């Protein structure tokens, strides 16, 4: 945890004692370090500075409007998965020009909202969704910029609850289906094909899956180009993990190096969707002990926060340190 330290037996964030915050605003409360957020954005940007790229922070990782506002000030774009997240981004940034919209269940109303807000592009996850986008764009008299989320069927070697890039998952379409969909949409007047997208999951701590997926996507890009479909953006999603309990994920520079090597000759802008790697260790849940109790040989410490405030441990047994 950067900028969270003990001094005089008290936990501080950026030299501010958390006891003071608890006394002034109460608990439970989320406390974030702006210095940590700024540092992580800077490190990520510097890692990719040698190639054309756009960093689109994954809003799902933390949708606090004040955090989104800071990211906008620092020049990042945003990856969203709902109309509600788009609403938050517009409140924070005032523009959707650097917004990309993911998710297999976009509604007609959300697609309309996205097109009216002039987002950068929509990531299409099925042929049926493509038809809904065409219909919505036609009604609005506009053109939809789209990328197709392509499933490379690579095992990301992460927890099955947060794996998204294999055949058994609901996200995206397979390589061959993606090719057919690009060819079908090529001459649709309401559609502008601008990119190809791949996202394999979250909390990935090995480079192998990323490299394997890039090889598959690179072959598809070459195939499409030979069929008269040049693309501007390669959206490689997010998923880079962080350390919770001894994991050793690749550093941003190592991650960037593999992506740069695989994409530098494609002539495309690489879009990145970092989420937890930016915000994961930039904040804490500040809580207060309410009561202690024992039942048999079990001892409980009851606090004023619940699983709704920090759901990962009860949902799938993830580890979080207690400070």
Protein language model annotation of sequence segments:
Residues 143, 217-219, 223, 255-266:
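Alpha-helix-loop-beta-strand connector modules within alpha/beta enzyme cores
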Residues 258, 267-323:
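Charged (often Lys/Glu-rich) extended helix/loop segments that serve as interaction or gating elements
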Residues 109, 155-160, 242-243:
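Short acidic/His/Gly/Ser-rich catalytic and metal-binding motifs that mark active-site loops
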Residues 1-144, 188-192, 219-222, 226-229:
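A charged N-terminal "starter" segment
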Residues 206-212, 243-255, 281-291:
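Short glycine/threonine-rich loop-to-helix capping motif typified by GTGT followed
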Residues 200-201, 234-243, 274-276:
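Glycine-rich beta-strand-to-loop/alpha-helix junction loops that act as flexible
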Residues 116-117, 126-192:
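Conserved anion-binding
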Residues 58, 145-151, 197-199, 235-237, ...:
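Short beta-strand segments
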